[in-house]
Regions:
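Hydrophobic h-region of N-terminal signal peptides that target proteins for export
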Residues: 10-18
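Asp-box/BNR beta-propeller blade signature and adjacent active/binding-site loops
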Residues: 20-426
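Sec-dependent signal peptide recognition
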Residues: 2-7
Length: 426
């Protein structure tokens, strides 16, 4: 009898229940369709925007700081590298970070360290990966920068957003008071502002810290386009300032640029007290000046020194000698051939003229330089070569090398390999 009951249920009852369920879902779907059919175009757009704003809020969830990333993120699992940042701690450790997977919505951040001036490097020892199979659109950690502040604390700034850029972005930071220890302790992630940043902060003569964040002059990628219209007045380079050693950051000024791209702006303080901002555009490097520590900015223009550069990241930084350092694509100051070759230049007049022209890498497909100056005057520059399946490269040189146009310092080395992915991309 029990077998007959089970047979009856399987053959007759369950199909009926399934059909009833399908019928109910069909009715519900028709009701939903009717609801949308009654909406005007403006009402539909408003509905979509509200929905995408809820999805975008997934980027507001603090990411996990993974300090035990092996073996999941070992080099034999990696097939792509995009250079982000390099920095030295007070104890002499060098930290390096890069992007894995791709320059796309699936990217994540990895970091390694060196205790012998960049001769050898650890395996990945810190990873920030916002991806999750439980969310409808990919969460992206796409750019970042290490910076040692005047107190000796190491910062790692990074961007967490959705779908590469959701129209809002998100600049986050973690810090470590013991970055030279065997197991550094990192603070909980703190969201600083909308937008992102790829350049180190600058400490002004006033003691203020200036951070060149940027909110893309773009409404958002893909389904997020137009999701945050209230942020449109803030699109451009957002000059964030801290007067309390990074406890808080406040927006001081905004500078937009024509032909905008990923701004990747840099700020240095000139000897006359003005701030000099340089930024990436689709037409090359443009500049703007602030006479009041970042509140107001001049209309942007191409550099007075006629620095020719592709739409790609460059590097400008004040050295301890007082000179400015420039790292650019191309072997000549007034010429480039796309994202090929890197050269180093020095300025003794706050960027009006440049000397040197040391070619630190003569290969094609070299991009995204970042660097620092060690206490002994050695300049360290990291960048990527042939992103996937390429390498994160490192150059060590001095001001004397730049002025000579060749290596004259015994400790200088070029085209060193810091990170190389070992997995073959399918």
């Amino acid at each position: 009898m029990n077998k007959l009951i089970i047979f009856f249920c399987v053959v007759f009852v369950l199909p009926c229940l399934a059909q009833n369920d399908r019928d109910l879902r069909k009715v519900r779907n028709l009701k939903h369709e009717a609801k949308f059919q009654k909406m005007s175009a403006a009402e539909l757009k408003d509905y979509e925007t509200k929905l995408m704003r809820q999805v975008a809020d997934l980027a507001l969830i603090p990411p996990e700081i993974n300090t035990s990333p092996l073996p999941e993120y070992d080099y034999d699992t990696q097939h792509y590298v995009m250079s982000l940042t390099i920095e030295r701690t007070p104890g002499g450790r060098i930290w390096l970070a890069w992007i894995g997977e791709c320059d796309c919505p699936s990217s994540y951040l990895l970091a390694a360290s060196s205790d012998d001036n960049g001769e050898t490097w650890s395996k990945p020892r810190l990873v920030i990966d916002g991806r999750s199979s439980a969310i409808p659109i990919q969460r992206t950690v796409i750019i970042g920068n290490f910076w040692t502040d005047p107190t000796g604390k190491l910062w790692l700034f990074f961007d967490q957003t959705l779908n590469h850029f959701d129209g809002r972005g998100g600049l986050w930071a973690i810090t470590s008071d013991n970055p030279d220890d065997e197991n550094p302790v990192w603070s909980a992630p703190k969201r600083i502002s909308h937008g992102a940043m790829l350049s180190k902060p600058t400490v002004l003569s006033t003691g203020e810290w200036v951070l060149p964040s940027y909110l893309l002059q773009n409404e958002g990628f893909g389904p997020f386009k137009g999701t945050f219209p209230e942020l449109d007045p803030y699109r451009g380079v957002n000059v964030l300032v801290s007067t309390d050693q990074g406890e808080s950051w406040k927006l001081r000024g905004i500078r937009t640029f024509p032909n905008p791209d990923w701004h990747e702006a840099m700020i240095v303080e000139k000897n006359d007290g003005q701030l000099w901002m340089t930024a990436r555009t689709r037409k090359g490097i443009m500049e703007s000046f602030s006479p009041d520590k970042g509140y107001t900015w001049s209309e942007p223009d191409f550099t007075a020194a006629d620095i020719q550069h592709p739409s790609s990241r460059f590097f400008v930084r004040r050295l301890s000698s007082g000179r400015l350092l420039l790292i650019k694509n191309g072997a000549a100051l007034h010429k480039h051939e796309g994202r090929n070759q890197f050269s180093a230049w020095l300025s003794e007049d706050d960027g009006k003229t440049w000397k040197g022209g040391l070619v630190i890498d003569d290969r094609n497909k070299v991009t995204y330089p970042d660097g620092f100056e060690a206490p002994d005057g050695t300049i360290y520059i990291t960048y990527d070569h042939n992103r996937g399946p390429g390498e994160i490269a490192l150059a060590k040189f001095t001001e004397a090398d730049i002025l000579a146009g060749r290596l004259v310092s015994p400790q200088s080395k070029l085209k060193m390999t810091a990170v190389r992915p070992l997995k073959k991309k399918k």
